[in-house]
Amino acid sequence: MAKNNIKNDAITPRDVDFAQWYTDVCRKAELMDYSSVKGFIIYRPYGYALWEQIQSYMDKRFKETGHQNVYMPMLIPESLLNKEKDHVEGFAPECAVVTKGGLDDLEEHLIVRPTSETLFCEHYAKIVNSYRDLPKKYNQWCSGVRWEKTTRPFLRGSEFLWQEGHTIHATEEEARSETLMMRDIYEETAKELLAIPMLTGRKTEREKFAGAEETYTIEALMHDGKALQSGTSHYFGQGFAKAFNMTFLDKDNKLKHVYQTSWGVSTRLLGAIIMVHGDDNGLVLPPRLAPTQVVIIPIQQKKAGVLEKADEIAAQLKAAGMRVSVDASDKSPGWKFSEAEMRGIPVRIEVGPRDIENGHCVVVKRNDGVKTQMDLDENLPQAIHDTLETIHKEMYDKAAAFLNSHITRVNTLDEVGKVLDEKGGYVKMNWCGEEACELKIKELYQATSRCIDEHEEADGVCPCCGKKAKHVVYFARAY
């Protein structure tokens, strides 16, 4: 086996300037373009194809677990948003507000949806009367608008694409179970589709979603050592139910309020894919996600039989269920190799006259550049399938090793700063549960609490105040 070590000079090296590297990959791989409005990007076909793959996988999982898709309006009356005090206070600073309809001032301002809890609540209150109407488990695929001051493609935009699920239940137990199930589906999606390991846990009171009783999160670690919140699932209890009068008659004919959840992931996942797996040559896509899993590049394609053989291989692989393309453009093989690497296509097959004569082809793995000769026979589809599965495992294992090596247990404040400055990643520490100590770490080290460990009990004292610890919590600098 040999390694392919082409360097793409169009991309700033990742370890020289991570932010510029990220922007270069987004642009050069043709995932997006900037529009004339800050924070509102154009999703180019290749970038949107990645989102479609995520949609397809997750939509199937949602429907398997009893959820239905709906669509709610984009505009929310201001009075409706104001019904839940904590919720509106959390979102008011980032709301986009419509004040005119045509040339006329509106009697009531309309909020461009930052999230749709209030719309779902209003609707559920109308359609639910009895325990027989429950549960209601709705999801919508849409865009949201939150007026961000600092924007970056996919990671933080004023407009973002996402799914938001909203469910109501007759019992607290059922709603809590739903909350954790959806968090687990997000974690599964990250592992099985994106090859990204996640840190999971519960958000602190300060970091939880506005209006929620509890928020559960999946947190990814980027190559630069910063965390990225990649999905959240919220348990609301009956707060919204009481504000919106969402009630039902139970089996004993008693009037009760419902219990509610919401959960969502967004196109932030595209940013995670780039920053976890990408390298100096561009994207590195997990095979199960990649819109094109295999690209076949004919060498000396004008010679008799070369293009025909490339098409024959493509037909074989497509028949076996793989997503395949043949690059028969008139560009040079070197250009095609570079383009395939930039786009992160997991497997490249090279086939030319000599390969055909000898009955083999050259297979190149994008994740590590390893080249292998494979026979051009009926076993090729299985060999390529196995290679794709190997790539997924290697990518996940590499990301998991990076994550695990960047979780550092600390016992003092000085250690927090030292680890974050020199190593990055997560610091794992005891915490008393007081917001003042949480804020102290943010002020001193620009790090926020990412989640509370659900599996480890605190044993010791909080390094900020010396009081007995209540939780083990992870802090990190984050996007």
Roles of regions detected by a PLM:
Residues 1-479:
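NTP/phosphate- and nucleic-acid-binding module
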